Amino acid sequence: MNNQDAVASILHECKQVLDRLLLETPDVSTEDKSEDQRCRASLPSELRTLIQEAEEMKWPFVPEKWQYKQAMSPEDKTNLQDVIGAGLQQLLAALRASILVQDCAAASAIVFLMDRFLYGLDVSGKLLQVAKGLHKLKPATPIAPQVVIRQARVSVNSGKLLKAEYILSSLISNNGATGTWLYRNESDKVLVQSVCIQIRGQILQKLGMWYEAAELIWASVIGYLTLPQPDKKGISTSLGILADIFVSMSKTDYEKFKKSPKVNLALLKEFDHHLLSAAEACKLAAAFSAYTPLFVLRAVNIRGTCLLSYSCSADCPPGMKSVHLCEAKEAFEIGLLTKKDGELVSGKQELHSFIKAAFGLTTVHSRLHGETDAVRAARQLCSEAVGKLYTFSTSPTSQDREGLSQEIMSLISQVKGHLRVQSFPNLDVCSYVPESFKCGLDRLILHGHVDFQQILETYSQHHTSVCEVFESTCGNSKSNQRDTKSEVCITTLKTETNTADTMVATLERVSSQDSRSTASSKMSKKDQGKLQRERGRSWTRSKAFRVSLDLDMETETEPPNHSNGGTDVFNKSLRDNSSSCSWGRLSGLSSSTSWEEVNCAVQDVVRKGSGQEKHPVEAQSSEAVSEEPKRNRSSRAVFLSSKLRGVSLQTTGDDNLESSPSQLHNHTSILPFNAKDTCLASGAGLVETAEGSNNTSLQSSHSCGSDSWSLSSSDRFTDVTTNPSVQEEEPSGIMGDVPESKYDFKDWHGEKNGGTLTEICTGPELTFAPSSVDPEGETAESTDDGLSPSQVALGCLEGSHSMSTRRTFFPDGSVQNADSAKTGCSVRDQTVDPDASTVDEEGQMLDSTEVCSIGQDGAHRPRALRSGQSAEGPKSFVNGSRPSPIFDEDFSTTEEGEELGSMLKSSQNSSSYSPWWLKSPAFSRSSSDGESSWSLLNSSRSSFASLAGQTSQEILEARTLQPDDLEKLLAGVRHDWLLQRLENTGVLKSNQLQQAHSALLLKYSKKSELWTAQETVVYLGDYLKVKKKGKQRNAFWVHYLHQEETLGRYVGKEYKERKGLRHHFTDVERQMTAQHYVTEFNKRLYEQKIPTQIFYVPSTILLILEDRTIKGCISVEPYILGEFVKLSNNTKVVKNEYKATEYGLAYGHFSYEFSNHRDVVVDLQGWVTGNGKGLIYLTDPQIHSVDQKDVTTNFGKRGIFYFFNNQHASCNEICHRLSLTRPSLEQTSKV
């Protein structure tokens, strides 16, 4: 009966019965009563006893027989999971029968009893729905704390950290109070608090806050030991988590933790090295839970990993290396022996742990004996198993999952055969660990006594603040009395920023319109009004982005419902920032998630939204670009031309006029096809001409994350500068050739022109630089140098959005016309739109822009400064005064070469139309090493592929890791050494998805400034199906053996435009630096009793390997589910309507002061709570630093000037409370 589909089907049926009973309550039939009695009688006596005790609320967690006993009899050594598994079918039948007779107390007890077992089967979401249904039907039904905490665990696994934090903090603050549950004694409340503290520690571990996580796990151990009978299971779990944290913790943090006067763990005193302490902790953890195989497996896996890592470290004496490797070998073998060959494994967590043990053992054999045939065979088997595990996780049917589970365990058995795993003698046949592990059980775990309640008091500020942020009453209370103390219950789910109370939301999801009305009628008027306001605020988002309202299910985002046109969002004012974030609002796909959109058929939005009539320009433009018949294009283009004169497609004169999907998603570059100065208006999809030159209408379509230029509905050619589609593969070889694409189009007079794209691009007078300007791009880049010819060409070609006269405003107040392109490219202060990108310094998109001239040799030249103009930063403006903070700027983060293109976009203030032409022969020049601008733009600035004289063989040698390289990486290397070692590795092609790879996991510690590697296996899965398209990178699911959370979800990111390895490592180093700064910032907030904490999601690197040769590189971070918002970019734009922005700007100010005036963290984006307080999770920062000028998004001095004079023009309350010192204008100009 342990079939997931069958279990899920019965639970779904139970939920449907509860939904019907919620609408009407019929009399209980005699047949139903008889069935209920029959089902109860069919249960084994042990299960009947457990159900009775659960109804009586005898314990908050279903206990194991051995959990609280020191002396055990043979019957105490059984595993409760085996008992539940054997009677699962009868329990499910009893659950359904209890619901039919409306015995919610009995049904709730059965849910409680099955909870842990079904969590192992990966069907907790369905069971939690039943628990909520029971509570909705009869709010007085007691729901066990274990079930409420399960909700928190599932939330952590699925990425809903805000929700999990609320549930846990509420239980801790309210002494475990939840709904109508009654505790039998005070020690049960301590147990619940200890478990909650433990899970909070796991959340901080997930966020990479190693020291803080270790403190919480230590606190949970204190709680378990405070009980009248110590909880051996809880202690075992906490010791295992603590050991896992020690693996990632720096030596500095470990020494600090070890020497802390309040931390009194005995094992810390016995070992000097954190990895040896971790290994010993795992040995104890396995011994404490010797009768539960999964607990033993997890503990010995961590022990083996610790010993393996220590054997590779520089601290391990050479003579002890083989000793520790043998101890690691023993640990992994113990784990593999927790299941017999042919024994069924049902859950993802256990399967993952077995593969990890097999891989760990393979790695140990490799270190001890080298790359033998057995090692190579075992490694291949582990890789196959990881691939099957990913398929297992995503398989829709239980039959497939059961077959895959058997195949995975068969592969594990083969690994055991290749590596000759033998069973060990054991006196206790029920125990899964050898007798040698049990000798440490008698030793003291703690020195001295610590008061658990005092420990909780130190965290009370955090728990209270989280509860205040999400304060709500039970959604089912008929009186909804607001003066009663708020306690978490199974339906109190108001913890997401983009949904209303999910009690109502979940009910709406499963019921008809009538049922929704009925449920709504049960709410108070105040709650109904509140719900309406919430719906009103989120209406725009809900049309374009639909997320599962059942916040307990591990669901991905659903596709948008295009049946409503997809353009309802366009009817909102540009200034209406409460309904959705501005950069998502303009596109019609409101941003509710951080990951970049792939596989997005934007044309569907355009086609189905083209019927809108409220804004004729948008509707007409949409049709013209996407699906207008050829015969109508000429007249349509004339109409659009007249409509678009004087109108900026980025910022309109009418606040209520918003850009169409085609304008924002189908941005076509202005393509001069020949020397006749023809240019294409990107937003309108038409060509404005001069001197009677031919005109061409182009359209741009997006499919699977790649852009394609469409000349007609059937004639297309692909823009090869963007990432290829999922189905297509990058050109083979180290450097792929640029394919020659045929084009075929007709001008407006019906004359057909043909040729190759390469011929067009490399014409005698103009170089074709195909790239689209995406207002939702991520980050702008910067260099101190001027512009390369191709980059100037790219920027100039992208700029003509409104066909208006271009002028350049300089800090000294001078104005220069843009048609001076014969000698260079002048740029100006852009009138900005709400999608402000993070820009690069090269083109200087914003106020302090410089003219870049190009010499005859094709080299870029920075313009000469005018007299009186400072090179340090802008000091004066056109109107003679510093502008106020800009709120309407392009809001995404801009990359190198994009800033210039954005700068050259039309100004809203332009009053006349004047097309301009690029005639400089410099634009047709190739790069100095013979590359065309096309191929230069198709790679990174730092692409080693363009280095003259570098051969493929040299690149291949640089990518191959020698044994000495691997040894150093495993021991830990500094950032500069790593970058130097990877310097000549060239530009890697895109990673191959849908398969498993060998990999090196590299973690960076800002405190030690070391990168430490770990061998692993990773499966690169499907692209994320999300609604926010990123400019730079694609995001896809990954699952790797050494991820922090076995059941957690992780996302990999790779650049769409292939780049060198330096970019990936610099990105992670920057994010972990921001995390280091924010940790110190949080301490200052806590000291001042400010109820907010900011976290940066940790990021790591996975180097994809094939026989020790680097084949790819991705960055990886935990998946966070919730509403994704962007608070600022890396130049001047900031969204002050979010309360979180106040804290973010204060954090940026703090980072400047904490770094001794050298760094400012900017480009704030992530997940915030509804009121912007409590908890803020951020990702993908940029840092303006005076030290690292090799990063193109780092503006250095000018970036710091932007921050203090535009984004953070005056200090806020947080700055004052933290006593931050504000630099003067002169200081920021001379940083």
UniProtKB/Swiss-Prot annotation:
This is Alpha-protein kinase 1. Pfam families: Alpha_kinase. Keywords: Cell projection, Cytoplasm, Cytoskeleton, Immunity, Innate immunity, Kinase, Serine/threonine-protein kinase, Transferase. Serine/threonine-protein kinase that detects bacterial pathogen-associated molecular pattern metabolites (PAMPs) and initiates an innate immune response, a critical step for pathogen elimination and engagement of adaptive immunity. Specifically recognizes and binds ADP-D-glycero-beta-D-manno-heptose (ADP-Heptose), a potent PAMP present in all Gram-negative and some Gram-positive bacteria. ADP-Heptose-binding stimulates its kinase activity to phosphorylate and activate TIFA, triggering pro-inflammatory NF-kappa-B signaling. The lineage of its organism: Eukaryota, Metazoa, Chordata, Craniata, Vertebrata. One of its GO terms (cellular component) is centrosome. It is found in: Cytoplasm, Cytosol; Cytoplasm, Cytoskeleton, Spindle pole; Cytoplasm, Cytoskeleton, Microtubule organizing center, Centrosome; Cell projection, Cilium. Residues 509-522 have a biased composition (Polar residues). The gene is Alpk1. Residues 1003-1223 form the Alpha-type protein kinase domain.
